[in-house]
Every structure is written in C-alpha cells, then in structure tokens.
C-alpha cells in the first residue's frame, strides 16, 4: 500500500490541500473534525522536514530552565509539552544555575527554534535583549528581567504567596517568624519577600534581622540557612521557606538538630508536590499550578508564532493558595501571650 499524501486527505474530505496544510499547522479551519478523522483513517504522516522548509519554521520550541531537578520546573515543562501537542517538539535547555551557560544557550537558539519559553536566573541578566533576539518570539515564565517590557510573561502571584504564609503563622500566634528567601535578584525571591514583610508590617510585627536568611533555591542553601537559624540564642518559633528544594534542606537540618515539627518549630514551604503529603508531618505549603503556568506560556507563545496575537505584550498572573496540613500545628500552643510580647520586644532591641 502506497503512503498517503496530503492530496489523499484533501480528496477524502473534499477540501483544498491548503486547508489541510493549515489544519496540520495548528490553525482553525472548517471541517477540522473530518480532516482529523481522514488523517487517522489514511494513516497520513506529514513530511515535517518538507513542511518546515516550505514554512521557514523549525518545528522546535526551546524551554530554558535553571534547574530541571526542581520538581516545579519539571512540571512546568510537562505543561508546556502537552500544550504544544503534535505541532512542536520541545528542546529542553537546563542552564544549571549558570549565567554564562544561559547566555551561551540563548545565543545559539536564534535561527534554530521558532520560539522560546524562558526562566531567567536573575532579573538583571543581560543574556537577551529585543535587539539580540530580533523577531524570535519569547515568553517569560516564573521570572522576568527588569528590561523585558517587550515580551509576554506568565507569573505566579508571589507577593500573595508570601503574604498568605506569614499571615497563617501570625494567626496561629507566632511572632518570632523566620524567612528563608530565594535570591532577591530573582522575581520570586524578591516578590515573596515583599508579601512576607507586608503581612508582618500590617500586624505591627518587627522581624529580628537575624531571622531573615537569603539563600539560593537549592537544598544545600536551605540546609545552611536553617542551620544558621538554629545556632541563634533565641530561635524562631516558625519559618517560611520560599521554595521546595530549600524546604527539603531545611527539614534535614531540623531533623539533625532533633527539632520537632511543629512542636518546636512550625514550617511552611512553597510549591506543592506529592512528597509534601508523605513528609512527617505532612507539609503546609503555598501551592501554585506549574502545569498551568507551562501551558499558558506555550499557548501565549504559539499565538505569537502564528501571528494571532498582535496586541502589546501581556503579563498573566496565576493564583496561589495556602494548603494547610500538619507542619504548623493548630495553634502556637507552646508560647503564652506574655512570652510573645517579650520576644517581640527582644526582636526590636536586636535591631537597634
């Protein structure tokens, strides 16, 4: 049996070859269901190389992430992959938290891919510019650059996440609250800190400066930051940790120091994962939908590639929510109001 051609599909449905071609390229056309059925019945397989030569496209979309071992980025890539469907293949580039590798990778992508979904390492990164990219479509996800007004972005509501975490701990009676932050040079690190500090300020709580630890979004960084907190003469009674990998490291440090969660210290992490429910005790977290962020980024990018979206760049915000489990306990039962007032005063004195 000879191999089916695009002409065979068009003849079976009763449409032009150009209509079938547009359908295969992802455009909305009439008789889409009939075309899809005919392609399946005839086992038609488009010649991708020939099609790309004709359209001037590569059929590839690059997804650039800083650390693929982070479950959040793995889920984000999967969401983008599903949204791309059969039209595009994903070229995954893991920069390994290396700025030089990030610059190298972005330069090599020009002319090799049809678009880029990009998670930059730092807001101040100079790896890209409108001039260097030319007309290559790009969508930021999770993080943006300070000079990125010309590009679309899909971001979680990080400020709200930091605010929800701090507010929950305050409502449980905590006042000596520590914060293990990601790099303040990154969008999520900076915005989660803004939300956290806003919640404390609204309730008149002055944070001991020693309770703030800027880290690097890695497990080792979380371990080192928590170890530093545990070395203090007056330890915090609660901690918000600004990403999943740092939370793993921080929990390891707590275990090594025989600190009981939540009896000795309440813990809130950022990003939900299957293991969050398996940790003992199950982890309270700020949750966001990584699949959705990846899918929205891909959908936005495809609109740009196809020329459907001619509007100015847009920023899409994805909601976050607090998932309460058992790592914070029900109340800060081990501290009286008098003790809380004393620790607030002590924290204020430490700042002077």
Question: Which positions does each model-derived feature cover?
Answer:
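N-terminal helix-turn-helix DNA-binding module of bacterial transcription factors
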Residues: 1-57, 351
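Amphipathic helical "hinge" segments at domain boundaries
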Residues: 44-107, 112-115, 194, 201, ...
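Flexible loop/turn connectors
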Residues: 227-352
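Short, solvent-exposed amphipathic alpha-helices that sit
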Residues: 71-86, 161-165, 187-206, 221, ...
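Structural motif
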Residues: 90-110, 162-163, 214-232
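Flexible loop/hinge segments that line or gate small-molecule binding clefts
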Residues: 97, 118-164, 185, 205-206, ...
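Hydrophobic alpha-helical segments within soluble ligand-binding/sensing domains
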Residues: 154-179, 194, 219-228, 247, ...
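An alpha-beta-alpha
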Residues: 163-203, 210, 313-328
């Amino acid at each position: 049996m000879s191999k089916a051609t695009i002409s065979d599909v068009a003849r079976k449905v009763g449409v032009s070859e150009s209509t079938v071609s547009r359908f295969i390229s992802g455009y909305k056309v009439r008789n889409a269901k009939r075309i899809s059925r005919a392609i399946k019945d005839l086992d038609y397989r488009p010649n991708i190389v020939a099609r790309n030569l004709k359209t001037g496209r590569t059929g590839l979309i690059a997804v650039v992430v800083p650390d693929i071992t982070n479950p959040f980025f793995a889920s984000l890539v999967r969401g983008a992959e599903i949204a791309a469907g059969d039209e595009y293949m994903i070229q995954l580039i893991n920069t390994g938290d290396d700025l030089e590798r990030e610059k190298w990778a972005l330069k090599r992508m020009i002319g090799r891919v049809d678009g880029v979904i990009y998670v930059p390492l730092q807001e101040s990164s100079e790896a890209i510019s409108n001039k260097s990219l030319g007309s290559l479509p790009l969508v930021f996800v999770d993080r943006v650059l300070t000079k990125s007004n010309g590009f679309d972005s899909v971001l979680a509501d990080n400020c709200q996440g930091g605010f929800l975490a701090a507010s929950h701990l305050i409502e449980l009676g905590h006042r000596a609250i520590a914060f293990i932050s990601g790099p303040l040079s990154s969008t999520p690190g900076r915005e989660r800190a803004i939300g956290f500090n806003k919640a404390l300020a609204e309730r008149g709580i002055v944070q001991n400066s020693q309770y703030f630890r800027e880290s690097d979004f890695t497990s080792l960084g979380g371990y080192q930051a928590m170890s530093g907190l545990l070395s203090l003469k007056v330890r915090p009674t609660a901690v918000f940790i600004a990403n999943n990998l740092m939370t793993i490291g921080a929990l390891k440090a707590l275990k090594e120091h025989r600190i009981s969660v939540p009896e000795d210290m309440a813990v809130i992490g950022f990003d939900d994962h299957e293991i969050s429910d398996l940790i003992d005790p199950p982890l309270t977290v700020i949750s966001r939908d990584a699949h959705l962020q990846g899918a929205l980024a891909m959908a936005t990018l495809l609109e740009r590639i196809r020329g459907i979206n001619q509007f100015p760049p847009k920023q899409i915000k994805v909601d976050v929510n607090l998932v309460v489990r058992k790592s914070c306990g029900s109340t800060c039962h081990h501290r009286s109001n008098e003790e809380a007032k004393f620790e607030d005063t002590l924290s204020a004195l430490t700042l002077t």
